Amino acid sequence: MKETKATEKNSVPKNVTGKQNPVVQFIRENLGITVGLIVLCLILVIYDITQGRTVFLTTNNIMNVLRQVATNLIIACGMTMVIILGGIDLSVGSIVGFSGCVTAMLIAYSHWPLAAAVSAGILMGVLSGAFNGLVISKTTIPPFIVTLAMMNIARGAAYVYTGAQPIRIMSDSFNFIGSGYIANVIPVPVVYLIIIVIVSSFIMNRTRLGRHIYAVGGNPTAAKFSGIKNGRVLFFAYLFSGIMSAISGVVLASRMFSGQPTAGQGFELDAIAAVVLGGTSMLGGVGKIGGTVIGALIIGVLNNGLNLLNINSFWQYIVKGIVILIAVYADFLKKKNRKI
């Protein structure tokens, strides 16, 4: 009997009792999208080779991709929390435009100090996100309808506030936020992005709030019976999404040297695509910020690759739509196989 127990003890794999390497674990959990990103990069490298000149692998192009990815991924960090809860936020693109316009107007015409103007722009995201979270958590109105309403409200407010005209910003200190470089190499938006990704990952993986988000997204009824305040969790997620959208809006306005009421159109599509490609389930309860990072990189490299290949920009919408459909269908098949 003792010999049997000893044999069973020795037969336990080390990776069951020991802590698995987080990098290896991440790659295993996101194998499909990791391979997809690698294949996409290889295609562009092969394109460089066949053309006899380096286009994709230049430092300037890679930094440009990271700068563009930063705008989308900042939004996608908030969208990840919302989708893990089984919700959706269609207002993110409009909040991007409205926040950028408010910041631009206050700097260009009201001559507010930079910090105050940026804070006011981000405040627009706080108010918009709080509205979404409050209505969704206190009523039975679906998130799709609530955020669709906010999408129109924020976009309309941007047009009214600016008179439907771009607001030019002649401020080097403001333009540095979205167009500057650290040590003449790293784009400033990438620094903000790294901080936001770290904070978002910490919230989701190391805090009680993060555990509650997964619990409510997986089974809201069970979460409620276990003592979790579902309404507070929902409110925070939409508030956080609004703040991330506003930050992205300020960064985008800085990068474009202007606040434009049309800015951010279609950004909700890119954010949702990044989240879904990253392995987050549209049904809720499953997802990782790390997966969203890879998803956003795929979207960024895909957009950049299509531009380098001189493919009409309108095709990008078709490609991204197909990519989202495939990702959602793959998630459906994965869940179906698990049930079997």
Residue ranges and their predicted role:
Residues 33-46, 79-80, 122, 151-156, ...:
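Hydrophobic core segments of alpha-helical transmembrane domains in multi-pass membrane transport
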Residues 29, 143, 185-193, 234, ...:
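Loop-to-transmembrane alpha-helix initiation sites
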